[in-house]
Amino acid sequence: FLMADHTKAVVSTGNAEIDDKMGGGIPLGSLTLIDGHSHAGKSVLSQQMMWGSLYDGFRLSFFTTENTVKSLVKQMISLNIDVQDFILLRRLRVYPMEVASAREGNLDALLAGIRSERLRGSDIVFVDALTPFVLSTPASQVVSFFEGCKRLCSEGLTIVNVIHSHAVSSELLVRIT
């Protein structure tokens, strides 16, 4: 496996067409929000971004309300992306989150988990999807979560959050971007 090149300004998604549309890839140290309707391809895009990041040698953590480890591996294999070796080598750590606990609005615990993964050596953290958290959490706590993410990004962590469009009002979207 390759070692991460931390001198690069962006991380390739592993797909030249996607990279071109994103200005070369994912900017390192950035906070990215993938927002779209159900079945718009948000998870597929984030999985493609994960693959490119892993291929570039980065260490990733993936918090998911959408998959188990097994279903994630199966879904990615269906996209011709095999991450099993990365999981076994702990270059990709996957944390399934129960939707029921997410609905309690526990964004503080999620932020603590992201912070912990940074301390464990992750370069990039993906959260797919924030939707169950955001739907049951006051706007002020959602803003606080994104402010915490921005602080972690200022320390060099790259964070990619996925959310369904219906979960975020345009007013809240303006506050978090």
Task: Annotate each PLM feature.
Residues K8, S12, A40-S43, F62-E66, ...:
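Conserved phosphate/pyrophosphate-binding and hydrolysis machinery centered on Walker-type P-loop NTPases
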Residues F1-K8:
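Charged, amphipathic alpha-helical linker segments immediately N-terminal to NTP-binding catalytic cores
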Residues T32, H37-A100:
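Conserved P-loop
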Residues T13-G25:
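Pre-Walker A adenine-sensing motif
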Residues V99-A102, T131-F133:
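A short, flexible beta-alpha/helix-coil linker loop
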Residues L107-T177:
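P-loop NTPase motor core
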Residues G25, G52-S53, E117, L152:
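Hydrophobic helix-cap positions at the C-terminus of alpha-helices
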